[in-house]
Amino acid sequence: MSPLPSSGASGDLLADRRYAYAKGAFDEADFAAAADLARQALELAPHFAAGHALLGRALLALGAREEAVASLAAALALDPADPMGVRIDLAHCGALEPQAAITDSYVRALFDDYAPRFERHLVEGLNYRGPELIADALRRAASRRVRDVRFRRAFDLGCGTGLMARALAGTVAAIEGVDLSPRMLAQARKTRLYDALHEAELVAFLAGRAAGEADLVVAADVFVYLADLGDAFRESRRVLARGGFLAFTVQAHPGDGVVLGEDARYAHGEAYLRDLAAATGFTMVLFEPVSTREDRGAPVPGHLAVMERSV
């Protein structure tokens, strides 16, 4: 079940109060009370998208799939940009194709809300180490290619608060970061490690850059919010000079293709990644199983790859 919106405003004070009580009940796993209170809020404010989303999620938890889908669909119709991640819930219950589940608006809202506590929760709570793993992999990949590990210009896709730039300090002459979340970018700006920061979707950002402009593109736990990585790979190859690296981590699953996990992230199969790398003009320099973070104390399986633009 995707995260609930942190707040909701319907324009009706009493409806907002009922919604707050409903969200509190949901957070306490009292789904029957949450559904009842959400219905009360919607009686007062029928066009309250967050109220429909909360009702749908409570009904899903109660096993009332048909009613839940109707409520979730109503929420999506009222707010098609979907910052609440309703599409994810619809995909999980089979009412929407998983490839269409995650929107830019959802990712932006999620990380705007997450930004103030992002590093503390991710690093201390989840033992996150994606940037360090990528930095180490780049050193090993450079050694395999008998080349210097230093890079003249790097693009950090989904840069977040700047953890990747810290891990690459002293390795890149210039680094630019891109992220959907302005609040994450505000945190990254405080590091003073970036030569430029851009608020944009990553494929659109790459498409606006010159061919051969960079010699490193990094994406630490960012592709988990994209189902189809084809455009990201193709645009990364285009902006890379010959011999440049694309290094990234993703979540893994044992099968083929791409699946949407219960954690509202995509997991990519090894064969999918290898086939796509070859199809988009990359040579796989390094590919290995890793875990970049934990979930409830257990390692989350993933892949780490360093690919080279060889032609």
Regions found by a protein language model. Name each.
Residues 12, 46, 80-81:
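Short coil turns that delineate tetratricopeptide repeat
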Residues 207-217:
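A short acidic, Gly/Pro-enriched loop at the edge of an enzyme's catalytic core
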Residues 215-229:
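A short SAM/SAH-binding and catalytic strip from SAM-dependent methyltransferases
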